[in-house]
Design a protein with these regions (language model features):
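Glycine- and charge-enriched low-complexity intrinsically disordered segments
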Residues: 123-136
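Generic alpha-helical propensity signal that fires on short helical segments
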Residues: 42, 112-114, 130-132
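Low-complexity, intrinsically disordered short peptide segments enriched in small/polar/basic residues
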Residues: 2, 117, 122-125
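N-terminal capping segments
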Residues: 1-66
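...with weaker cross-activation on analogous glycine-rich loops/strands in unrelated enzymes
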Residues: 59-120
């Protein structure tokens, strides 16, 4: 199990600020990369180091498929303990169902942070389909 590293709070804040400033673009700032960068900031490790480096939705899907995952929810569930969204803490990750599209996001002090095609959005925890504990 991955553990939280010293200074993870500051590193998490930096990741959130960086992604808020980046454009919505596959391989730059998307629903997987926000979560993977969060995991890296908190634990010092990427979830799947070879799953980055894509530039399109198809490329992202191929990276997940290489690990036999159909979506980010399956990728997260293979690495982390599933928890009830109401038990999630800052820095934990989760997914929402956005009209059939499974999108990853991060639990923050402001709500559940996700990225759509245009911007970062903070949603209420009640919108989260599944949550995953990132280190402890």
């Amino acid at each position: 199990m991955m553990t939280r590293v010293k200074g993870w709070e500051k590193a998490l804040k930096e990741v959130m600020q960086r992604h808020m400033a980046l454009p919505s673009e596959f391989g730059v700032s998307d629903c997987y990369l926000i979560c993977d960068d969060t995991v890296l900031a908190i634990t010092g490790e990427r979830m799947y180091p070879d799953a980055i480096g894509y530039t399109s939705e198809l490329g992202a899907a191929k990276k997940l498929a290489a690990h036999d995952f159909a979506n980010v929810e399956q990728a997260f569930a293979a690495k982390f303990e599933i928890i009830h969204p109401m038990h999630a803490q800052r820095g934990d990750i989760g997914v929402i169902d956005n009209d059939g599209a499974i999108c990853g996001g991060v639990f923050t002090a402001l709500g559940f942070m996700v990225r759509d095609e245009n911007q970062i959005t903070f949603l209420p925890v009640t919108r989260v389909k599944a949550a995953f504990k990132v280190g402890r």
